[in-house]
Swiss-Prot record:
Pathway entry: Pyrimidine metabolism; UMP biosynthesis via de novo pathway; UMP from orotate: step 2/2
Protein name per UniProt: Orotidine 5'-phosphate decarboxylase
Family: Belongs to the OMP decarboxylase family. Type 1 subfamily.
E.C. numbers: 4.1.1.23
Length: 230
């Protein structure tokens, strides 16, 4: 599948900032937004309930990584928030991924984080003591996620084609680190433009600061959406 809307990363910590940003958009514009650790830990489940009450889709990106029983129970709780997508960390192993699927059920999309887009190959080898290539690590995690019946993975757009080649048809690739041409890449090491991500086969893209910190967030969002749609 291909989600037509870019997912907006709500890189805020307060309810007021979040509401002010969402209020910029007309009520009929239904967004797909990402709630990460900063916003969720600051505001808790109520921020999810508020955004869902506006009719937006919610991707809750908490990257759960714990023993299978704990992850299963946590996902069952998150399911009650009517989220549309959630993440777990692939490094937790296939049994943990299966437990996450059991807890969340078959409704929401469940994807696994492979290697963060802020991670370079040298960092992976030095910090994680993984001595394969970065791509081989990502493919290993992706195959584990597919085995556990997850819906896809978070990955760099540069890895999408290789992941699609080793996973079942319909396995989704969500790519963060998307930056419009000419924008600051921030702390991302592996980035692409929306157009490049579309052409290479990404199913979802996540864009944060280029939209949330833009002088005109609505116009910037619409431009990125148009570029993503092709």
């Amino acid at each position: 599948m291909k989600e037509e809307r870019p997912i907006i990363a709500l890189d805020f910590s307060s309810f007021e900032e979040t509401k002010a940003f969402l209020d910029l958009f007309p009520a009929e514009e239904k967004l797909y937004v990402k709630i990460g650790m900063e916003l969720y830990y600051a505001q808790g489940p109520d921020i999810v309930r508020y955004i869902k009450s506006l009719g937006h889709n919610v991707f809750l990106d908490l990257k759960l990584h714990d023993i299978p029983n704990t992850v299963r129970a946590a996902m069952a709780v998150l399911k009650e928030l009517d989220i549309d997508m959630a993440t777990v960390h692939a490094a937790g192993g296939v049994e943990m991924l299966k437990a996450a699927r059991e807890g969340l059920g078959q409704g929401p999309t469940l994807i696994a984080v492979t290697q963060l887009t802020s991670t370079s190959e040298d960092q992976m080898r030095g910090d994680q003591n993984i001595q394969t290539s970065l791509l081989e690590s990502v493919l290993h995690y992706s195959k584990g996620a597919a085995k556990a019946q997850l819906d896809g993975v978070v990955c760099s757009a540069q890895e999408v084609e290789a992941i699609k080649a080793v996973t079942p048809t319909g396995f989704n690739c969500l790519t963060p680190g998307i930056r419009p041409k000419g924008s600051n890449i921030g702390d991302q090491k592996r980035v692409m433009t929306p157009n490049q991500a579309r052409r290479i086969g990404s199913d979802y893209i996540v864009v944060g600061r280029p939209i949330t910190q833009a002088k005109d967030p609505v116009a910037t969002y619409q431009a990125i959406k148009a570029e993503w749609a092709g």
